[in-house]
Regions:
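Conserved active-site carboxylates
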Residues: 101
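Long, positively charged amphipathic alpha-helical accessory segments at protein N-termini or as interdomain linkers
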Residues: 5, 64-69, 73-94, 104-250
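N-terminal lobe of the biotin/lipoate ligase/transferase fold
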Residues: 1-89, 110, 117
Length: 250
């Protein structure tokens, strides 16, 4: 796998997609940058990043065995790896805020954006992208955002941080499940581990639906397909949502 550090770049994910468009990428790659100027998250949200303070990281995996039906496994594997990696640095109170954020307490410290490329209804390649807030201290009216430095009161060497990340990717065999028949993966254990780290699980939260309506309920679980199950307040039945239908109000 080739590893490339980029200087100032709009988005490491977008850079990879441009290479794909031009058919100039034909093997697995890692691209990373400390100066991403136009990072994006799910639903087109912008990831605000000061130069040389944070890490933008994208992995390109060609010809994976993950299929469309089980593609949420990509998110599960990525989220659990990042939790494990940040735990190495003793970041406290880590959890996964469905569908694509990593939290420390009630503060977002990492966003994930995984993208698939299709060919004849099959996944031809995967871009696994995430950004970790490391040394940034100002988040411009983003009250729920934070960084490792703000949380631990420590300054981090970005180069060393990235070296440890890449080393752990290899040591933990992170890439293996993407090239393994998904039917042979222990999906029950994966989703159980994911739910054990689910942000505000079993707690009453407020949610905004895609039609603008607000409702309140307890987060129960996420299933292997990425569906969030919520028990509505004062009711015993579950309501199920995909990531485009609902947003948690922190």
């Amino acid at each position: 796998m080739k590893i490339i550090k980029l200087d100032a770049i709009n988005s490491t994910n977008d850079y990879l997609k441009e290479l794909l468009k031009n058919k100039s990428i034909k093997k697995n790659y890692i691209f990373y940058s400390y100066n991403q100027t136009n990072g994006k998250g799910q639903r087109g949200n912008v990831w605000y990043s000061e130069p040389d303070k944070n890490l933008a990281f994208s992995l390109f995996l060609l010809s994976p065995t993950v299929n469309l039906k089980t593609q949420f496994i990509i998110n599960i594997l990525t989220s659990l790896f990042i939790i494990d990696f940040l735990d190495y640095f003793k970041i406290p109170n880590l959890s996964i805020k469905w569908p694509n954020d990593i939290m420390s307490g009630n503060k977002k410290i990492c966003g994930i954006l995984n993208e698939i490329q299709l060919k004849k209804k099959h996944i031809e390649s995967i871009i696994i992208g995430f950004g970790i807030n490391i040394n940034q201290e100002n988040f411009n009216n983003l009250p729920n955002a934070s960084s490792l430095k703000l949380i631990t009161k420590k300054n981090y060497d970005l180069n060393n941080f990235t070296k440890i990340l890449i080393k752990k990717l290899k040591k933990n065999n992170f890439f293996v499940p993407f090239f393994t028949d998904t039917e042979t993966l222990n999906q029950e254990n994966l989703i159980s581990s994911y739910n054990n780290k689910l942000y505000c699980r079993k707690k009453l939260k407020s949610f905004k639906l895609s039609n603008g309506k607000i409702f309140h309920g307890n987060i129960e679980s996420v299933d292997i397909n990425g569906i969030l199950n919520v028990k509505e307040k004062n009711h015993s039945f579950l309501r199920s949502f995909n990531s485009n239908e609902i947003k948690m109000i922190i």
